[in-house]
C-alpha cells in the first residue's frame, strides 16, 4: 500500500521571492532629507518619498511609519523602443524633479524624505510594483498626477490632476478642474488609516521600523 506524499516546491528565483528581497533591501536604505542638495550621481533605479512631519494634517498619521506617499522608478532604457535614455543620471534627475514639485506646491521640504536604490531596470520594475501593491501609496493610489510631466499644448489642455487639486502651486496650466477637493481629502484620510492598519502584514516588513 502506497502512502500519499508530495515534496514541497521551491523556486529561489520566483517573481514573488525576488520582489520581496528587493523590497527588503530597499527598506534598509537610509532616509535622505529632501532638503539635501544632492550632487549628481549616475544610474537608474528605484525610489520612494516619505512624509515624516506634523504640519500637514492630511499626512500626519504617517509620521511614525516608514510608509511611502509615492513610489517610482527611473529607467536607463525606454520601455517602448529599448533605446537608452539620454540622461546618464536618470535616478538623480527624477528625484530632483520631484523635489521641485514638492517645493512648488508649497509643501515643507524639511518634512519629506527620499529613499533610493540603484539597480537594473528589470529589478527596479519588480520593486516598484511590489512596493506599490503592498503599501498603495497615497500619491500613487489616490492622488494621481504627481509624477506626470507637462509636455506642450496637449498637456495644458488636459484636466487638472488629483494631486495638483490638493497641492496647487506647480507652474502648469490646465483645461479643466474636474475633481472635488473635499472628496479627495476624505478619500486620502480613509486610505491612509487603512494602510496603517495593514502596515505589518507585508512579507518583507522587518521588525521595529515604526519609530
Predicted regions mapped to residue ranges:
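Boundary/linker segments flanking structured domains
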Residues: 1-69, 73-211
Amino acid at each position: 500500500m502506497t502512502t500519499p506524499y508530495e515534496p514541497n516546491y521551491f523556486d529561489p528565483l520566483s517573481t514573488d521571492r525576488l520582489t520581496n528581497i528587493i523590497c527588503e533591501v530597499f527598506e534598509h536604505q537610509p532616509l535622505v532629507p529632501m532638503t539635501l542638495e544632492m550632487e549628481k550621481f549616475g544610474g537608474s533605479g528605484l525610489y520612494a518619498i516619505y512624509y515624516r512631519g506634523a504640519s500637514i494634517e492630511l499626512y500626519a498619521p504617517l509620521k511614525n511609519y516608514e510608509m511611502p506617499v509615492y513610489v517610482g522608478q527611473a529607467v536607463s532604457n525606454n520601455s517602448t523602443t529599448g533605446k537608452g535614455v539620454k540622461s546618464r543620471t536618470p535616478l538623480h534627475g527624477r528625484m530632483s524633479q520631484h523635489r521641485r514639485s514638492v517645493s512648488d506646491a508649497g509643501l515643507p521640504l524639511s518634512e519629506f524624505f527620499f529613499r533610493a536604490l540603484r539597480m537594473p531596470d528589470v529589478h527596479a520594475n519588480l520593486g516598484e510594483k511590489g512596493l506599490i501593491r503592498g503599501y498603495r501609496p497615497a500619491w500613487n493610489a489616490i492622488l494621481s498626477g504627481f509624477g506626470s510631466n507637462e509636455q506642450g499644448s496637449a498637456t495644458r489642455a488636459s484636466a487638472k490632476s488629483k494631486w495638483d487639486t490638493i497641492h496647487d502651486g506647480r507652474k502648469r496650466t490646465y483645461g479643466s478642474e474636474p475633481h472635488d477637493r473635499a472628496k479627495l481629502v476624505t478619500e486620502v484620510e480613509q486610505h491612509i488609516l487603512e494602510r496603517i492598519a495593514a502596515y505589518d502584514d507585508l512579507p518583507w516588513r522587518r521588525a521595529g521600523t515604526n519609530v
